[in-house]
Amino acid sequence: MSTRLEREVARRRTFAIISHPDAGKTTLTEKLLLFGGAIQMAGAVKARKSGRHATSDWMAMERERGISVTTSVMQFPYGDHMVNLLDTPGHQDFSEDTYRVLTAVDSALVVIDVAKGVEAQTRKLMDVCRLRDTPVMTFINKLDRDGLPPLDVMADIEENLRIECVPLTWPIGMGSDFKGTYNLLKRELHLFSASHHGRIQEGILIRDLDDPLLDEHLGPQADALRMDLALLEEAGTPFSREKYLRGEQTPVFFGSAINNFGVRELLDNFVDLAPAPRPRPAITREVSPHEESFTGVVFKIQANMDKAHRDRMAFMRICSGTFTRGMKLRHHRVGKDVTVANATIFLAQDRSGVEEAFPGDIIGIPNHGTIKIGDTFTESKEELKFTGIPSFSPEHFRRVRLRNPLKAKQLQKGLEQLAEEGAVQLFRPQVNNDYILGAVGVLQFDVIISRLHDEYSVEAAYEPCSIHTARWLHCNDRKVFAEFCDYYSAELAIDAEGALAYLAPNPWRLESAMERYPAVEFRTTREIR
C-alpha cells in the first residue's frame, strides 16, 4: 500500500444525514457546508422572498415543495479531512432511496427535533443502520424553540432506537430561555448568539463552571446547569469510541441548525470520532480500502440531472485503490472494459471533473443505459460482486395509463429509466401488458407523473389496482414451483430486473398462498443483481 493512499483513506469521512421530515436535516446540511467553506451563504429553504433554495434540493419539484426528493452528494474539505456528505430524502415517502444510500456510507448522523423526539421514519432508517452496525451520531435540533426535556429526548432515543445515548454537549434552557451548551469533553461553555442572514456568528466561551461570568450570563440557570452536570457525572455513561464504532452507543449533541449554533462543535467531533472508509463485503471476500487495485460499487442512478443534456448519472462509491481520469475499468455484470474519462464530483448540481479520487469518495459516471444499481467496477480482472444493496417490498401500487397511445415507446422508456433509479419499482403482470408501479410512499407516484411530463413529454395518469403487497419468490423444488406458478399465474409479475414477484391482492390471499406452498419463499427484500 502506498503511503499516499493510506493518508487519503485516513482523512476521508463519508456519511449520510437521516431524519424524519421537518426535523431540520436540510438546514443542518446547509450549515455543515457553510462551516466547511463549500458555500458562502446558507440558502434558507423556506426563504421564498430571497429566491434562494437549499443547495441540496436541486430538482425542480424539490424546490417547489421544499422537500429533498433525491439523494445529493456533496464533498468539502474541513481542516485536514475530506468530508463526503450524502443528503438523503427527508420526506417520509422517499425512504427506499435512503435505505440504499446507507449502504454507501461509513457512518450516519441522525437529526432529532427536540419538540417531537423519535419519529417513524427515523426508526426505520435506524433499523437499516443496525443491520450493518453503522456508527451513528445524534444532533438534537431546534433548541431555540420549546421542546421536551433533554433527558426525556435521550430516553426516547434509547427506548425507540435501541442505542445507548451519551451527551457530549448539554443544553442550557430552551426556547426563549435557551442560553447555550456546555461541552462535556472540553469542559467549556458556549453561549448562544443567534446568527443573521445565514452568516456564521460564534458564541462566547467560558471554561470554568465557578467563573462568576457564568452566573452573570446565565443567572438562575447557572445553578441548574451545575446540578445537571453533577447528575450526568454521577449517573451518566462514559463515552466509548469503540462502542460508537460498533453501533452500540451514540454521542449526542444539542443545538439550533438554523442559527448555526452547535454546528461547528458537531463537525469538529464528527471528523475526530467518525470512522475512515471501512472494508466492504463482496460475495467472494471482504475488500479493504487500502488495497492498491481500484474497486467501486454503484448505489444510485439519477436520470436527467441536467434536462438540457438529457443525461443520466451513476453514483459510485469507491471501495479501494485510486481512481484516475481515463482509467480502464471492468464492468463485471456486462463483462466489458470501459474507459472512464469524464467522472464528476458534485456539490448538489454543481459538477467538477475528477482527476483522481479515493476510497470513501462518491463519483458520478455517465450512464447511457448500461449501468444499474449494484454494479461492480474493478481495475483488475478479478471476478468481484459487492453485496448488501437491497430492494424493499413496496407498500403502495398504481396502474399506469397513457393518455396518448402514440407515446407508448416514450412511456416504456421513461418508466424503465425512472425505475432504474430505485425510487419506484416497475412490474409487468404475466397475463397482460399493464405497467404496475410499486412505491414505499404515495408521493413517489406524483414525482413519476411530473417527471414523465417534464423529461419525457409523456402525459400519463394512474388507476387504482387491487394489490396489497409484493413478494419476491424463491423455491428449490422445480416441480412445486411450476405448480405454484400455474395456480397463481394471474397474480405473478416480472420486475424491472426480470425477477418473479407475487402481487398479493390482499393479506388473506398472501397468507393462503404461503400455507398452501410452504416450500416457496415469499421475500420482502431482494438483493439487487
Curated annotation (Swiss-Prot):
Location in the cell: Cytoplasm
tr-type G domain boundaries: 10-278
GO biological process, one term: regulation of translational termination
GO CC, one annotated term: cytosol
Family stated for the protein in its record: Belongs to the TRAFAC class translation factor GTPase superfamily. Classic translation factor GTPase family. PrfC subfamily.
Keyword GTP-binding attributed: yes
Protein name: Peptide chain release factor 3
Pfam family, one: RF3_C
Highest rank taxon of the organism: Bacteria
GO molecular function: GTP binding; GTPase activity; translation release factor activity, codon nonspecific; translation release factor activity, codon specific
PROSITE patterns: G_TR_1, G_TR_2
Organism field: Nitratidesulfovibrio vulgaris (strain ATCC 29579 / DSM 644 / CCUG 34227 / NCIMB 8303 / VKM B-1760 / Hildenborough)
Alphabetically ordered keywords of this record: Cytoplasm, GTP-binding, Nucleotide-binding, Protein biosynthesis
Chain's role: Increases the formation of ribosomal termination complexes and stimulates activities of RF-1 and RF-2. It binds guanine nucleotides and has strong preference for UGA stop codons. It may interact directly with the ribosome. The stimulation of RF-1 and RF-2 is significantly reduced by GTP and GDP, but not by GMP.
InterPro entries: EF-G-like_DII, EFG_III/V, G_TR_CS, P-loop_NTPase, PrfC, RF3_C, RF3_dom_3_sf, RF3_GTP-bd
Chain residues that bind GTP: 19-26, 87-91, 141-144
Major place of residence: cytoplasm
